Amino acid sequence: MEKPAGFWIRFLAYFIDGIIVSVPSYIILFIINSVFVAGAVATNPYMTEEEYLVKYMTLAFLPTMLIMIVISVLYYGLLTASKMQGTLGKKILGLKVVNEQGERVSVGQGIGRYFAYILSGIIFYIGFIMIAFGEKKGLHDIICKTRVVYK
């Protein structure tokens, strides 16, 4: 059985992944918001603040959030299920994600693991803090029947 990865190395991988996902996400956010502001002012320079906010929420903010979620799901979910067996942050640090049998996870497990990540962080990050103890599994690992180990 491979050695399980502890809290701090996994935290560093998560931090690296956050940077990798944030850069393209914020570039997209900047482009969409810039186009929206220019378009909104050009179409009606006299709109009220309420009209502007409604347009912004429907035409810029919500689509941007949807794009950012899709980027995250694809990055975390598909890379975890790929031959790399983990994200770029995990690869850089020599880690991989495996199922309970020590094999590569399925696409469903990879995507499910991303959404379980969110659940792990909802209540004061307790689902992540669990990694520091016992079997070194976070809530997302337990839910998706995965573990992170050294290559």
From Swiss-Prot:
Compartmental location: Cell membrane
InterPro entries referenced in this protein's UniProt entry, alphabetically: Pra-immunoreactive (IPR051791), RDD (IPR010432)
Annotated Gene Ontology cellular component terms: plasma membrane
Residue ranges of the TM segments: 12-32, 59-79, 114-134
Record keywords: Cell membrane, Membrane, Transmembrane, Transmembrane helix
Membrane topology, as annotated: Multi-pass membrane protein
A Pfam family matched in the record: RDD
Name of the molecule in the record: Uncharacterized protein YxaI
